[in-house]
């Protein structure tokens, strides 16, 4: 009894002191965007919304919002369609890759991967029609019939051309295709192409049956109705319909000005609206609108016969978009920009945001900035946070100059006409659309460095006092694709030229920004390794300095290391290409990640390397000799194998991964080590450990390679090991692999040299 009382006393003492957020070690977290609501459907208990291809639900009874992703219930990502089948009370979730989930309101999910796994090139599904217990899927080759009650694919009808939509009407299957409208009798052999007849040449993206009439919709034209007598479709006066739904015995059709609510095919009410609804549904007297970036909104018809919002928009705190091309930590704040240098001609909406204290803050966006500048706001590529003011940021862009933000609002747009930035086409009337800026960083003197591409002077510095310095170097004059800029521990500046005049550039300015007379610089376009093997990479994609001062380089032909940056200027300089022994008795070794497209590299608290590629993420040991993990879409919750950027929170070890589909986090077991062992820094979490918890217990705030011993209250050694950087993890088990009993356990952490140690307590309750 006394022992239990002591444990409870320690429990309440620790509860009062506990300030560290419990982070589940080795777990994944996704950060989907829920800002752009495009589709909505209602079930008996919930309203579902599809936002940027991500799913959420709103439970009207208790106003609970639930987010679904690959780490909880779903079996995929990037959803194309959702439809609710009231006959079987299931939601069908169709993914962009052809995968299918069926989900009930009580959140039981059945995955149907058969269509995704078919050996066909185009697996996209273009439309879903619900009739009875069936879902008819319009595909790139025909129609797939899914029995939603039995959770099986029942039939496949191959037409050999793209189908946009389907409908069942008067014992016939209708298909809106790229070649017009086709139909077939339901009692015929629908797998026989001869059973299908062409009805008309109309092009529709949607088909629906209402009031025993078949409707077709072309969002660029009008709603049409089938004239069976003439075997054609007749246009109606309802034009540019972009939201269309049938529910509770009524049909709703909306464009940018009106919502038409049909009681039957010949009787309707016209509701004025200016909400730009993307989709609409109805439940218990409330219209639910997918209102784009205004979120999921509830509406009612007011006395003026207008749609009026009757509640707050449902927009969970999240990134504004699933764009994450470059990420970086400033302290514990994750900075994110979406966009790229536009090599492939794709323009991404300007996207700048940060994640801090479990909350997303999205900067001023889109049209508001374009209205101020008179220019498009696209392809933001890099960001630097002012060390003197965490609310002050500079953001570079691929072609439209540089933006300065204060408290998330743009306060200045730097162009070739109002600053010392230069244009690629200085004499062109459209010169402000050809101002290429990239890589941005602050040095330890609060000077902001950035790149101005494809002009005579590439390197620019806005000094701490606001004055501007341009550092000219003939070697790199006019180079078009410098990407990132970084400063090593000796104050040298490094740039990677991604492609077109690609290579690695180093500038040693000897600490004198304005005096270029003592500068030394070097540019290397090719790579020769320690074995004399020479490479000419098409792309130099990334560079990072590790804890030993080595610089790791990622290219399209693999991974290389500048082992001693002091030697980069030497004529006989060679890169190190890490060789991993095969250990098969042959004495042979293989180059680490040879011929792998290495896109980004980050260094964790244990000096291990997190390497992003076009085939997932690798975690390798500090020296690269051991591959600890290779995470892919196939073996983890990673949402894409195409990795853009990786950043690590050195306080808690969390690894943030930016992919071409959005952001993912992995709770890593290595954080930046402390300089000295201080009791105030050493914390364990979760603490206390409650009965339902089965995960790892984390001890943080340690020095490099700390020796950790965990003992019971009677002094028995339960567990021991060495920290990864500043973190040590324990699975709550003894040396025999059994879960330890309730009690107070002592954690003794000692520095690598044995001179300093601290003791903390962990309370475990079983």
Protein language model regions, located:
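Bacterial Sec-dependent N-terminal signal peptides
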Residues: 1-27, 766
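Carboxylate-rich, polar loop motifs that coordinate divalent cations or form catalytic acidic clusters
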Residues: 22-682, 717
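Short, surface-exposed loop/turn motifs with a glycine/proline- and acidic-biased composition
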Residues: 70, 723-754
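Residue-level recognition of strand-loop junctions within catalytic nucleotide-signaling folds
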Residues: 668, 700-702, 750
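Glycine-centered coil/turn sites that cap beta-strands in beta-rich domains
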Residues: 676-709, 727-730
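Short, glycine-anchored, charge-dense loop/turn motifs used at functional sites
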Residues: 707-718, 745
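Edge beta-strands of extracellular beta-sandwich domains
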Residues: 757-762
């Amino acid at each position: 009894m006394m022992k239990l009382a002591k444990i409870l006393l320690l429990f309440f003492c620790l509860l009062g002191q506990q300030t560290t957020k419990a982070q589940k070690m080795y777990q994944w977290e996704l950060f989907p965007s829920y800002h752009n609501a495009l589709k909505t459907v209602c079930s008996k208990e919930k309203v579902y919304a599809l936002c940027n291809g991500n799913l959420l639900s709103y439970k009207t009874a208790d106003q609970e919002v639930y987010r679904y992703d690959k780490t909880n219930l779903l079996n995929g990502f990037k959803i194309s369609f959702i439809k609710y089948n009231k006959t079987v009370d299931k939601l069908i979730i169709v993914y962009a890759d052809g995968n299918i989930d069926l989900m009930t309101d009580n959140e039981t999910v059945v995955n149907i991967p058969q269509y995704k796994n078919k050996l066909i090139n185009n697996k996209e599904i273009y439309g879903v029609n619900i009739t009875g217990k069936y879902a008819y899927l319009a595909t790139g080759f025909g129609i797939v019939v899914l029995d939603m009650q039995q959770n099986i694919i029942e039939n496949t009808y191959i037409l050999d051309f793209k189908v946009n939509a389907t409908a069942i009407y008067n014992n016939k299957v209708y298909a809106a295709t790229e070649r017009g409208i086709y139909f077939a009798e339901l009692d015929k052999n629908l797998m026989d192409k001869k059973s299908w007849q062409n009805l008309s040449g109309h092009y529709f993206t949607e088909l629906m049956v209402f009031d025993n009439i078949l409707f077709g919709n072309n969002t660029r034209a009008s709603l049409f109705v089938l004239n069976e007598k003439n075997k054609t479709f007749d246009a109606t006066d309802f034009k540019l319909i972009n939201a269309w739904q049938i529910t509770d015995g009524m049909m709703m059709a909306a464009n940018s000005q009106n919502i038409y609510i049909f009681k039957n095919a010949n009787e309707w009410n016209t509701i004025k609206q200016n909400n730009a609804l993307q989709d609409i549904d109805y439940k218990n007297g409330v219209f639910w609108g997918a209102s784009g970036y205004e979120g999921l909104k509830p509406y009612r018809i007011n006395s003026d016969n207008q749609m009026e919002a009757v509640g707050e928009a449902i927009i969970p705190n999240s990134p504004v978009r699933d764009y994450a091309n470059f990420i970086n930590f400033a302290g514990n704040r994750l900075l994110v920009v979406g966009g790229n240098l536009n090599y492939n001609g794709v323009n991404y909406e300007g996207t700048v945001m940060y994640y801090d204290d479990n909350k997303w803050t999205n900067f001023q966006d889109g049209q508001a900035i374009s209205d101020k500048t008179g220019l498009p706001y696209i392809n933001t590529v890099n960001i630097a946070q002012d060390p003197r003011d965490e609310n002050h940021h500079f953001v570079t862009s691929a072609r439209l100059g540089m933006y300065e933000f204060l408290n998330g609002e743009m306060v200045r747009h730097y162009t070739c006409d109002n600053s010392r930035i230069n244009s690629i086409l200085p004499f062109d009337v459209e010169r402000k659309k050809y101002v290429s800026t990239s890589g941005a960083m602050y040095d330890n003197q609060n000077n902001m460095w950035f790149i101005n591409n494809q002009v005579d002077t590439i390197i620019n510095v806005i000094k701490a006092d606001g004055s501007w310095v341009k550092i000219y170097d003939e070697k790199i004059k006019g180079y078009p694709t410098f990407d990132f800029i970084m400063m090593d521990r000796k104050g040298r500046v490094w740039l990677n030229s991604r492609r077109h005049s690609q290579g690695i550039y180093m500038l040693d300015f000897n600490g004198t920004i304005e005096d270029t007379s003592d500068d030394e610089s070097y540019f290397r376009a090719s790579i020769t390794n320690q074995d004399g093997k020479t490479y000419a990479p098409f792309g130099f994609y990334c560079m990072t300095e590790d804890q030993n001062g080595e610089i790791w380089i990622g290219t399209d032909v693999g991974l290389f290391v500048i082992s001693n940056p002091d030697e980069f200027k030497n004529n006989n300089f060679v890169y190190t290409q890490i060789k991993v022994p095969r250990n098969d008795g042959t004495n042979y070794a293989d180059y680490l990640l040879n011929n792998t497209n290495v896109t980004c590299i980050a260094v964790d608290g244990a000096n291990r390397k997190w390497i992003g590629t076009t085939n997932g993420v690798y975690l390798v040991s500090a020296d690269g000799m051991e591959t600890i993990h290779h995470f892919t879409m196939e073996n983890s919750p990673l949402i894409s194998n195409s990795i853009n950027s990786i950043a690590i929170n050195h306080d808690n070890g969390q690894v943030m991964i930016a992919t071409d589909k959005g952001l993912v986090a992995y709770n890593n077991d290595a954080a930046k080590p402390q300089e000295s062992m201080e009791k105030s820094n050493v914390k364990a979490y979760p603490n206390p450990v409650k009965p339902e918890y089965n995960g790892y217990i984390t001890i943080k705030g340690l020095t490099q390679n700390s020796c950790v011993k965990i003992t019971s209250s009677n002094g028995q050694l339960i567990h021991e090991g060495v920290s990864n950087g500043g973190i040590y993890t324990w699975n709550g088990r003894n040396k025999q692999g059994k879960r330890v009993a309730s009690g107070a356990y002592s954690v003794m952490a000692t520095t690598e040299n044995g001179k300093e140690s601290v003791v903390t307590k962990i309370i475990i309750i079983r």
